[in-house]
Amino acid sequence: AQNKGPHKCGGVLRNYSGRISTYEGPKTDCIWTILAKPGSRVFVAIPYLNLACGKEYVEVQDGLPGAGNYGKLCSGIGLTYQSSSNALSIKYSRTAGHSASSFDIYYYGDS
């Protein structure tokens, strides 16, 4: 069950909207790439983020993995991001041995 739905570690997400949630499996790095229709943009909202700073972080990247990013985030309220193209990537990373904190990241594309 760990590899299904919003709790999966990474992957390409093509649905119009959805949610990315805490991955609690053994991997320490997860990268999700959200792809909207060509000409559309991707919007991401993180209502509440409270990770263990220094041990884990979320990174929002404007485009495909490795694109310019908005910095490493470990806490915040009401965070929103918008891509400049039809792709946006989200990376979650934690140090080995540290249990993942819970988080929910919501995304949608403009149509």
UniProtKB/Swiss-Prot annotation:
GO terms for cellular component: extracellular region. Keywords: Acetylation, Disulfide bond, Fertilization, Heparin-binding, Secreted. PROSITE patterns: CUB, SPERMADHESIN_1, SPERMADHESIN_2. It is found in: Secreted. It comes from the Eukaryota. SUPFAM superfamilies: Spermadhesin, CUB domain. Signal peptide: none annotated. Residues 9-110 form the CUB domain. Disulfide bonds join 9-30, 53-74. The modification N-acetylalanine is found at residue 1. The keyword Disulfide bond applies. Coiled coil: none annotated. GO terms for molecular function: heparin binding. Gene3D superfamilies: Spermadhesin, CUB domain. The keyword Transcription does not apply. One of its GO terms (biological process) is single fertilization. InterPro entries: CUB_dom (IPR000859), Sperma_CUB_dom_sf (IPR035914), Spermadhesin (IPR000124). Belongs to the spermadhesin family. AQN proteins mediate the binding of boar spermatozoa to component(s) of the egg's zona pellucida by a carbohydrate-binding mechanism. AQN proteins are secretory components of the male accessory glands being coated to the sperm surface at the time of ejaculation. They possess as well heparin-, serine-protease-inhibitor-binding capability. This is Carbohydrate-binding protein AQN-1.
